[in-house]
Every structure is written in structure tokens, then in C-alpha cells.
A protein has these predicted regions:
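Active-site adenylate/phosphate-handling loop in enzymes that bind or generate adenylated species
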Residues: 128-133, 166-178, 249-332, 378-395
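Structural beta-sheet core signal
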Residues: 183, 207-209, 242, 287, ...
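Conserved G/P- and acidic residue-centered "switch" motifs that form tight phosphate/ATP-binding loops
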Residues: 188
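A short alpha-helix-loop-beta-strand transition element characteristic
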Residues: 333-341
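RNA-binding accessory domains that recognize and position tRNA/RNA substrates
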Residues: 1-182, 192-238, 307, 355-360, ...
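Small/polar glycine-rich anion-binding or flexible loop at a beta-alpha turn
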Residues: 293, 341-349
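A conserved beta-strand->alpha-helix junction
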Residues: 228-255, 342-344
Length: 396
């Protein structure tokens, strides 16, 4: 019989009365993702999502790779289905996993029988299949404590399923069950990771990027768009809002004390982001801020920059070490793009001696020569909305 994927649910199984809502959203997300790889049937039974190719044209390998990036799944098994007959099960194990056993020094059997109508117990299935495999592969010894390879047999209601060790899923909750949020996306390492981490909790993520042409180049903008595209491999398509920020930065440079440049810039970014977010149905902002990492990310600095917004600000990286953030960036594939040497607006007009312990009063005084509302409205008129999908052509 053909290959099939068994995708095991994560914390969804712990949900109560609204569990069905989470399951339906997960199934919907998987169906949408599989469309790019051919015709697949997606159905859910016994806390497992079954993904079954419906014709020979389906891209099995591409679909399998994509399943690893779908939030809500804790483990994935690539299986061969067969009839619920002990001889057919053995033949399928031999055909599907025999080469793997020949490459291993030791193995063990693990069986699970959820269909109690099957005449053999789980232990008896393991004994029967394991005994035959030991005879057929004399160089691969049985070791139930620390095996080099494990053969799994699951006898379920529809069929028996044979597979090797499961692979880890993306975890988290299905995209779309946790509302919508707007991520302030720069070209650095942190903000793409922050977007990924909040998306992992079931949140649909949009992004806003502040573009300061001609102080920043088209390459810098393309870099940010590519980071957004890479994140969509996990969270699905997203909208990126590009905001023209040049006039605001020039106004800050010309009218404000230098030590407050970055903080005032951040306050404008937060307020503009909130207005775009509320217009797009987002209930929170997301930033890649990390306590103490730079001068604008002290506790006092974050207090004054966050004071201009009313909606929650999610900061998933706030207590992480930089190396932890880098590890996640490498895992999700954004690191190589983040380190490309194209500066963004955060590096424009950087003060030599930034204020690290500002107060709200100091910021209000520093901004007194700015027409905040006029500058914000002018920036909002420049917003360009771009929809990004993972299967788009790379931007750089």
C-alpha cells in the first residue's frame, strides 16, 4: 500500500470544550499547505491527522518537509499502511524498513494496538514481528534498552501502519486560533524570531517595516521582504506594510536633542504600528526587544517607547540570551539573510551617546518642536501593503 503521514497533535489534546475549534483550524491549515504539493486527503482520527496522497503525481517529499513547519503538531511519522493481518504487517515492515535494519547494529520493536478487535496484543505483535526480523537480519541484534533503530507498528481502526522513529513537529498551536498581531520587522536577527515565536502560539502575524530611502537602499527593503517570506514557511501568508519613514527621521534630526533620537524614532514607530494594526484587526504589537541588549532596550527606555500605545506589546525575546535567539534564527532559516550587510532605518542618525534612563517628561520635552500628528498622518499615507507567501520567488 502507499505511503501516508501520521501527524500527532500536541497540546491541542489538552483543550476542553473548544478542542474541536483547534482541530478544525489545524486540519484547514494542513489542507492549505498541501495544495502546493498535489492532491492529498487530510482527515483526523484518534488525535492524529492523516495525510494521504490521492494520486501518483503528488510530491511526497515536498509535502513531508512542509509538514515539519506546521504549528500544532508535536511529532510526524512517515508510514506505510497495510491490511490488519500479521503476515501482511511483517511483509510491509520488511519491504519498507528492511534496508534501515541492515544498516543498524541493534533494533527493537514497539507496537500499539488501538483496534482491540485485532487478535494479537501489542506485546504479541512485537514478539511475532520482532522474532521474524531477527531471523531475517542476523547482523542486527535485538536491544530493547538502547537500540540503534526502532520499528513501530500501529494497528488502528482503518489499517495497520508501519514506520521508523517519529520526527519532531513544530509544536505550538495552529495558526489562526490566537488572533492577529502586528510585528515591527527590521532587517536584524531578532524581529523575525519574535514573529516566529508569537506565530507558534497560534497568532496570525502581519508585519510593518519602516523604510528610509535614500538613507537605506532597495536591497535593505528586499532583505526585510525575504525575512518575511522565510517566516511564512511556518505561519502561512502574511501582509507586510512598508511605511515611508524618511521625513520623520529628518524632522527628529533637525528638531530634537541627539541623545533622544532613537527613543523618539521608536515612539513614532510604535504609534504608527498601532494605527495600522487596529485598522487591520490586530490586537497586539510584536517586537524583537531584548532587555539590556542595546541602549534603547533598557527597562526605562522600553517604558517610554511603549507609553504611546494602548494595545499589548508582545516581547517574546525579552529574557533570552543572544545565542539562544541565534539558535532559533538558524533553525527557522532566517540567520543567513539577517546578517547580510544592508542597513535599515534603525541605523540612520544613531546618537553617539544615547539616553539609557529616560523619563516620559524628558521625551515630551524633547519632542516639543515636532508636529507629531501631522508627521504620523503623512507617514500613514505612504503605506504600501504587500502579501508575501513562502512559495514566492526569493526577494534576494
Amino acid at each position: 500500500m502507499k505511503e501516508i503521514f501520521l501527524l500527532k497533535l500536541g497540546e491541542i489534546v489538552l483543550k476542553g470544550a473548544n478542542k474541536r475549534q483547534f482541530e478544525d483550524k489545524l486540519r484547514q491549515n494542513i489542507r492549505r499547505r498541501m495544495k502546493a504539493y498535489g492532491n492529498f486527503d487530510v482527515y483526523l482520527m484518534q488525535s492524529t491527522v492523516y495525510v494521504e496522497p490521492m494520486d501518483d503525481e503528488a510530491d511526497i517529499d515536498g509535502a513531508w518537509d512542509a509538514c515539519h513547519k506546521i504549528f500544532g503538531l508535536v511529532s510526524l511519522c512517515r508510514c506505510r499502511a497495510c491490511e490488519k493481518d500479521i503476515d501482511k504487517i511483517y511483509d510491509t515492515v520488511e519491504e519498507y524498513l528492511g534496508d534501515d535494519l541492515d544498516c543498524a547494529a541493534t533494533f527493537k520493536m514497539e507496537s500499539k494496538r488501538s483496534d482491540k478487535r485485532f487478535p494479537l496484543t501489542s506485546i504479541e505483535i512485537s514478539q511475532e514481528i520482532g522474532g521474524r526480523l531477527a531471523e531475517a537480519h542476523p547482523t542486527c541484534k535485538v536491544d530493547v534498552r538502547k537500540p540503534e533503530y526502532t520499528v513501530f507498528v500501529e494497528v488502528r481502526d482503518l489499517a495497520a501502519y508501519v514506520h521508523g522513529p517519529a520526527e519532531p513537529g513544530a509544536g505550538g498551536l495552529p495558526t489562526g486560533v490566537g488572533g492577529r498581531a502586528m510585528c515591527l520587522l527590521s532587517g536584524g536577527i531578532d524581529s523575525p524570531v519574535a514573529a516566529y515565536m508569537i506565530a507558534k502560539r497560534g497568532v496570525e502575524v502581519e508585519c510593518v517595516h519602516f523604510f528610509s530611502y535614500p538613507y537605506t537602499s532597495q536591497l535593505a527593503r528586499d532583505k526585510v521582504m525575504e525575512l518575511a517570506r522565510l517566516v511564512t514557511a511556518y505561519c502561512g501568508r502574511m501582509t507586510v506594510n512598508i511605511v515611508g519613514f524618511t521625513k520623520i527621521q529628518e524632522a527628529i534630526r533637525d528638531n530634537c536633542p541627539e541623545e533622544f533620537f532613537t527613543l523618539i524614532m521608536r515612539r513614532f514607530m510604535m504609534e504608527i504600528s498601532q494605527r495600522i494594526a487596529l485598522g487591520d484587526g490586530c490586537g497586539a504589537l510584536i517586537t524583537g526587544e531584548n532587555l539590556g541588549q542595546v541602549a534603547s532596550q533598557t527597562m526605562q527606555a522600553m517604558q517610554v517607547t511603549g507609553a504611546v500605545v494602548d494595545i499589548p506589546i508582545f516581547m517574546p525575546l525579552i529574557g533570552m540570551d543572544k545565542e539562544e535567539i541565534v539558535t532559533i534564527a538558524r533553525k527557522i532559516g532566517t540567520m543567513e539573510t539577517s546578517v547580510l550587510p544592508y542597513e535599515d532605518c534603525c541605523t540612520v542618525f544613531t546618537p553617539k551617546h544615547p539616553k539609557t534612563k529616560p523619563t516620559i517628561g524628558q521625551l515630551i520635552t524633547a519632542e516639543k518642536n515636532l508636529n507629531r500628528e501631522a508627521l504620523i498622518q503623512e507617514a500613514l499615507e505612504t503605506v504600501e501593503k504587500i502579501t508575501v507567501k513562502y512559495d514566492d520567488e526569493p526577494f534576494i
